[in-house]
């Protein structure tokens, strides 16, 4: 999945789905760290991808909450 495609998909999510996705990605990141510590990880590039996705989702979450507070 390309980054632009994932960002487009993330923008379609509501705030509850974004929170759920952030939790899932953080869990995946924890599992990757555990695999790296036990030397079972071969795909180290996934760290960068997951961290970037978490940052994108957090940014979307902040902008959605900011737009809700300004519209209320």
Curated annotation (Swiss-Prot):
Keywords: Ribonucleoprotein, Ribosomal protein. SUPFAM superfamilies: Ribosomal protein L29 (L29p) (SSF46561). One of its GO terms (molecular function) is structural constituent of ribosome. The keyword Ribosomal protein applies. GO terms for biological process: translation. The keyword Ribosomal protein applies. GO terms for cellular component: cytosolic large ribosomal subunit. It holds the Pfam family Ribosomal_L29. InterPro entries: Ribosomal_protein_uL29, Ribosomal_uL29, Ribosomal_uL29_sf. NCBIfam families: L29. Belongs to the universal ribosomal protein uL29 family. This is Large ribosomal subunit protein uL29. The gene is rpmC.
């Amino acid at each position: 999945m390309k980054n632009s495609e994932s960002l487009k998909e993330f923008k379609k999510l509501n705030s509850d789905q974004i929170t759920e996705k952030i939790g899932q990605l953080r869990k995946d990141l924890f599992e990757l760290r555990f695999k790296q510590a036990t030397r079972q990880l071969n795909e180290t590039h996934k760290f960068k991808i997951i961290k970037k996705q978490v940052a994108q989702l957090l940014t979307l979450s902040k902008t959605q909450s900011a737009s809700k507070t300004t519209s209320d």
